[in-house]
Amino acid sequence: MPRLYLLRHAKARWAEPGVKDYDRGLDASGKADAEQLGIDMLEAGYVPNLVLCSGAKRARDTWNAIAQHVEADDVRFLEGLYSSDAAGYLDIIRESDSTGSVLVVGHNPMMEDLAVALSREGEEQALSAVRRGFPACGLAVIRFSTALAEIAPEDGYLEAFLKPHSL
């Protein structure tokens, strides 16, 4: 059964004069959270075959911190994950041609909207947590009984929702 991992980038630095939103990196707590998430993903067996990562610096930095602990067969940086809505994210996932599990590193509100839309059922604690909000460096783990190319809203089972300070 393939898994879809939806990861909101870790906590970014505040905007600085002359720095575009796209170019904001992680702050110290964001780096630490992402590194810890990489450790916890490895320990839980949450290892993707494919990573689809927003091209924004904070998303790339998040993946790079996780990648110190978790390896993927293929990593793609996609500009569409910076500006798309949840429906656009779903199209990108379907079109990825992945036969295994996929990690998407992106942004809110798209992550939260997509996690809620895909997860009709799941572990109560995970469902409750994701409905309360999707924090920076939050990770939704959604399991499907079909290939990711065929997923549709309410097809998934939310098996876990990891967030900083509770990992």
Regions of interest found by a model, annotated:
Residues 2-81, 120, 134:
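Active-site-proximal alpha-helix that buttresses catalytic centers in soluble enzyme cores
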Residues 4, 101-103, 139:
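Residue-level preference for the first positions of well-ordered beta-strands
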Residues 11, 56, 109, 146, ...:
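Short, glycine/serine-rich, charged loops/turns that create anion-binding
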Residues 59-61, 86, 111-112:
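Short, well-ordered alpha-helical microsegments
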Residues 64-104:
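Helix-adjacent hinge/juxtasegments
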Residues 101-119:
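A glycine-rich beta-strand to alpha-helix segment
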Residues 119, 123-157:
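Domain-level recognition of soluble alpha/beta enzyme cores
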Residues 156-167:
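Short, solvent-exposed aromatic-acidic interface loops
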